[in-house]
Amino acid sequence: MTKFTEKATAITPNREIQPDEYFNETDHLIYCSKCNTPRQCRHELQGKVLIPSIRCKCQQEIFEQEEAQRKLHEKQMEIKHLKTSGLQDKALYDYTFSKDNGINPEIKLAHNYVSNWEEMKSNASGLLIWGDVGTGKSFFAGCIANALLEKGIPVLMTNFSRILNTLTGMHFEDRNQFINSLNRYSLLIIDDLGIERNSDFALEQVFNVIDSRYRSKKPLIITTNLTLSELNNAADIAHKRIYDRILERCIPVRINNRNIRQDNATANLKQAKKILLNNHAPNQN
């Protein structure tokens, strides 16, 4: 008998053998009865033989499955938290690529923006999505927001009316702190630029938000009913400095589509009319 075998034989397992285990007389280790792989290993350290417990093959498979489920749950909770924080209107949850009806050819640009996000982020490249009312600009931006949020990327989609309501009544320091907090998001999406009130205070705060984002070197997406000509030919200095900041970093994308909102409303009215005409009034007796 060798010296190594003598040591191994002299040392007994440091725990009881369970019903689903057996003791291997060859290497003196406990094995799993199901997969026939060891649940112990042998180490020699400073002349002493140590026999710690390890996972057998089937235990390792169960562990990996449970670990995958745990990570998936954590990821789902993270995404849920990001969406709660980043999508301030519940309707935005439905603005996803899977809900696209295929009538907007420009949607491929939204796909490309998401696919090339790391490069867009690195270059602080944003989008200026412009076009008539109801053509799907918010849906376009929302698809980008949801796709990135599903990847665990912090996105905030809001509008200046909401931002201005928050800033109104704040002290100067608090306003700056709030505006700076918007830069915690990897992508900031401002929906419907131009519908906010046009006071001096509003214009100043709109510029502060845009300028802060510009200086943070993080991408910004803007949607607006304003035309590119109106943005390039601002009526005054206050608007010009806002638009210049946007145009410097945001790639213009025109959504030249039918009025989807009007089409949907018309379809809903037709369906309601059909229901009214095809159904008899309930018996009131």
State each model region's role.
Residues 105-114, 124, 145-185, 197-204:
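Short glycine-rich substrate-engagement loop in P-loop NTPases that contacts/grips substrate
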Residues 127, 156, 189, 221, ...:
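Hydrophobic/aromatic beta-strand patches that form the interior of the parallel beta-sheet core
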Residues 192-193:
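Walker B catalytic acidic pair
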Residues 121-141:
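Walker A/P-loop nucleotide-binding motif
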Residues 153-154, 184-187, 216-222:
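Loop/turn-to-beta-strand initiation segments
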Residues 1-101, 265-285:
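A short, basic N-terminal segment
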Residues 87-91, 96-127:
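Pre-Walker A (pre-P-loop) alpha-helix and adjacent loop at the N terminus of AAA/AAA+ ATPase modules
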